[in-house]
Amino acid sequence: MIELGINIDHVATLRQQRHTAYPDPLAAAVRAEDAGADLITLHLREDRRHIQDADVYAIRPRLRTRMNLECALTPEMLEIACAVKPSDVCLVPEKRAELTTEGGLDVLGQFDAVADAVALLTEAGIRVSLFIDPDAAQIEAAARAQAPVIELHTGAYAEAEGELAERELERIRAAVDVGLLHGLRVNAGHGLHYGNVQAVAAIDGISELNIGHAIVAQAVFDGWEKAIRDMKALMIQARAR
């Protein structure tokens, strides 16, 4: 069964826009689990633009499912991850000027640093995922770095249309095959929404999709729980075909 990770970053974005105490990411996480989320994903960025350190520490002990903490490959973030001990840490690239994560982690270009981080987090009892582009060389490097999980960046597919979207989808399919060949758990995410999720969810071998912005946006109209249930239903329907 394919799993749905609910990214709560943009619940925190709404809060930070006015520097209020609401909406509370912890409440969003708990209610997401009630609605069927299989895990809760949150990105503690270096610039703290949405999720704050206090959120991470407050949410971790309250979850009944899993916490998937996204963070950059920096000493500060690795120290926080080891202190919090989430079930999973997904290492992602970060640029301060970006609106959202723009590309995958360059495992090849910083192999030693990635391998060291994987070893550190694994020693702390944390499963490590690397957020990478659907590229065979990067996947092979992730396997050599001893990461047990990869998350394929689906942004190029999400932004494409027509024939280009189909080509990007084929890249994802091929990347899944490479990941499985290397014994990796393969997840995916970025830019997925109600109109494009099923093509990705239908790919055998993908274990988990992490989705946030689209669900937060739909919740404005339908409510948080319904927005989550509807997304999960689309994923399950696609996988059952």
Curated annotation (Swiss-Prot):
GO terms for cellular component: cytosol. 1-deoxy-D-xylulose 5-phosphate binds at D9, H10, R45, H50, T100. The keyword Cytoplasm applies. It comes from the Bacteria. Its EC number is 2.6.99.2. One of its GO terms (biological process) is pyridoxine biosynthetic process. 3-amino-2-oxopropyl phosphate binds at N7, R18, G191, G212, H213. One of its GO terms (molecular function) is pyridoxine 5'-phosphate synthase activity. Keywords: Cytoplasm, Pyridoxine biosynthesis, Transferase. PANTHER family: PYRIDOXINE 5'-PHOSPHATE SYNTHASE. NCBIfam families: pdxJ, PRK05265.1-1, PRK05265.1-3, PRK05265.1-5. Homooctamer; tetramer of dimers. This is Pyridoxine 5'-phosphate synthase. It comes from Bordetella avium (strain 197N). The gene is pdxJ.
